[in-house]
Amino acid sequence: PADLDEFVRRYRVDRILLAVPSTTRRRRAEILRRLEALNVHTQSVPDLHDVVSGRARVDELREIDVADLLGRDPVPPNTELLDASIRGKSVMVSGAGGSIGSELCRQIVLLAPKRVVLFELSEIALYDIERELRTMIESRRLDVEVFALLGNAHHKYRVRDVLQSFGVQTVYHAAAYKHVPIVEQNLMEGVHNNVFSTWHAAEAALEIGVETFVLISTDKAVNPTSVMGATKRLAEIVLQSLQTQTARTRFCMVRFGNVLGSSGSVVPLFQEQIRRGGPVTVTHRDVRRYFM
């Protein structure tokens, strides 16, 4: 309403529920910009589509997410393609505890796989994502098996054993080092993890006869100007080479940009700085960042 400012002051409103889940991102961003000046705690009700599909409960109130500030609507996924690789299948995610791997796991369990195998090097990251998925599965009464396995994708025979033991049909290979400055300073480890681990995991998938192997790559693999980008491009070339050896396993690559809110990106850093009361720091005043 036009007199929202006066309404908030008169009735001492300290919380606003944003109940317009079906509105466009652009309109949502406009509303949030107006509410920002009121200094009132704002929460959102879940999208009706998420409620109907079981992704959310109708009584779940959500904090405003950075994605709500985007000025466009998200591009919906191709459900036919997802079903072909996930529904009723045994799916493994390597690097399952990372920011990208864990989000893949969250989305995969909602698409009715037979089982999800979480393959992760970090014990605490594996524990966290397993606990979260089991809670999600129980609360939404999903019929999905979850197995949490510690392991290094570089160890080909460990990967091979896991693929065979769980009858894995689809692999999402998200295990990698992705931070440009760190990989720049740790070149050998970057090559070891991003190139050789991909090679060994893909070879294991080839030998077992996995149906689909998807490498989570990066836009930095395009005409790479950093060690990290070069290692991911090498990993892509490895898969392209392996594809010439078989028609049984389909090797795929997807290139991500900077994912909004992923670990190590500036958005979580900004949020933490704001929670601590500032200041909010930037690398350079003229830097322009792009997110997906």
List each model region and its residues.
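Flexible, Lys/Arg-rich cytosolic regulatory linkers and terminal tails that connect or flank
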Residues: 2, 28-90, 96-97, 206
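Conserved Rossmann-fold NAD(P)-dependent oxidoreductase catalytic core, especially the SDR/UDP-sugar
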Residues: 54, 173, 177-236, 241-242
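NAD(P)-cofactor binding segment of oxidoreductase domains
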Residues: 29-45, 115-122, 165-166, 170, ...
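NAD(P)-dependent short-chain dehydrogenase/reductase
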Residues: 134, 203-206, 227, 233-292
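Proline-aspartate-enriched helix->loop->beta-strand connector
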Residues: 8, 12-15, 113-114, 163-172, ...
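Conserved Rossmann-fold cofactor-binding substructure of NAD(P)-dependent oxidoreductases
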Residues: 147-170
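N-terminal Rossmann NAD(P)H-binding glycine-rich loop of SDR-like oxidoreductase domains
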Residues: 90-111
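A solvent-exposed beta-alpha-beta segment
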Residues: 1-53, 121-130, 147, 151
